Structure formats: structure tokens, C-alpha cells
A protein has these predicted regions:
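A short acidic, helix-capping loop that chelates divalent metal ions and anchors anionic groups
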Residues: 6-9, 111, 160
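Short, intrinsically disordered, charge-balanced linker/junction segments flanking boundaries
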Residues: 168-170
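Catalytic alpha/beta core domains of metabolic enzymes, predominantly
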Residues: 23-29, 36-141
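Glycine-rich, proline-tolerant flexible connector loops at the mouths of alpha/beta enzymes
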Residues: 2-14
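Aromatic/hydrophobic pocket-lining residues that form the small-molecule binding cavity
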Residues: 15, 19, 112
């Protein structure tokens, strides 16, 4: 899972060069692109992903879409698409996505797996609403601070965070 470089303003050509460089230096790599404009300052377009996959089909194998501009419309054979939120899991599966990649799955893995399995087994969806409700609670806070705060109830090591992060006070 590789995000484009942060802090610099650049366009598709520079993003293409960045990922091309990685693939050329590590040709055995299998890369899931990380589309998260809020953190990197860059938003992947369908065009640049299609070009990367065309030129590097064995290395560019998927995208985690936390910007949510791709997961509903990007269709590339043998290419994995993962929305970045539990609230997008069921809809994503319905339109051909592979699953989700989400930090909150550290907490919601069992529920997310049940939604995933029920979808593939064509069972009635009885856990999706609960899965989305749990995610929405975390969305009310700084996601990573909330995750550390929750997980620190079971394991002290999650209380160790570096500034600017802190545990929740509520």
C-alpha cells in the first residue's frame, strides 16, 4: 500500500514517474495505490490509474480509495478496488470491489468479515447496519486517536501515541 509523496504539489505525470520509479527499482513488487487526497494532496484520476495498470499490470494490482472518487466508476479487469471505510463495504461489493482496507477494521474485523461472507454466500445482510454504526462513532472523532483510545482499554501499548495525536478525553 503506497501513497503518493506528500507535501509537494504535482500532477499526474509526476505521480506516474514516482510509481514507475518504484516498479523499475523493485520489479517484483505488487502495489496497491493509496488514494487519500487529504493526506497526500494528490487525487488519483481514472486516467492515471489506467495508464499505470496498462504499463505495469503485474505490479500495480489495486487501489485503496479513501477519497471515494474512484471506487464506484473505476473498472479494470483483474484489478482490486478497496474503499477505505466500513460504510462503503456492502455497496462496494455490490458494484465489484474486492473488500475494504480500513484502520478501524482493527476493531470491526469480525463484523466486516460477516458482511463480506454474507454477501458472497448470498445470505441476508444482518450485520451491515451495525458495522456502519460502529464506523460512524469513530468518524465523530479523530479516527486514529479514537482507535488508540478504544484499543487501549484492552492493551496498554495503545496509550503510547506521539504528538500531535492524543488519546480522547471523553
Amino acid at each position: 500500500l503506497i501513497m503518493p509523496p506528500a507535501y509537494y504539489k504535482y500532477g499526474d505525470e509526476e505521480a506516474y514517474a514516482f510509481f514507475s520509479n518504484i516498479v523499475q527499482r523493485v520489479p517484483e513488487s505488487e502495489i496497491v495505490l493509496y488514494n487519500f487526497e487529504k493526506l497526500s494532496g494528490y487525487k488519483f484520476s481514472k486516467k492515471i490509474i489506467e495508464k499505470l495498470v496498462k504499463d505495469y499490470p503485474k505490479q500495480i494490482v489495486g487501489v485503496k480509495d479513501s477519497t471515494y472518487n474512484l471506487y464506484e466508476t473505476l473498472k479494470i479487469p483483474n484489478f482490486m478496488i478497496f474503499p477505505g471505510s466500513e460504510t462503503k463495504l456492502l455497496k462496494g461489493l455490490e458494484i465489484g470491489c474486492s473488500g475494504i482496507i480500513s484502520a478501524i477494521c482493527n476493531v470491526t474485523a469480525a463484523l466486516a468479515r460477516k458482511v463480506y461472507d454474507d454477501f458472497h454466500n448470498k445470505n441476508k445482510q444482518t450485520f451491515n447496519e451495525k458495522l456502519c454504526a460502529v464506523r460512524e462513532v469513530f468518524d465523530n472523532y479523530n479516527l486514529i486517536s479514537g482507535l488508540h483510545s478504544f484499543m487501549s482499554e484492552e492493551n496498554e501499548k495503545y496509550k503510547r501515541v506521539l504528538p500531535p495525536l492524543s488519546l480522547l478525553s471523553e
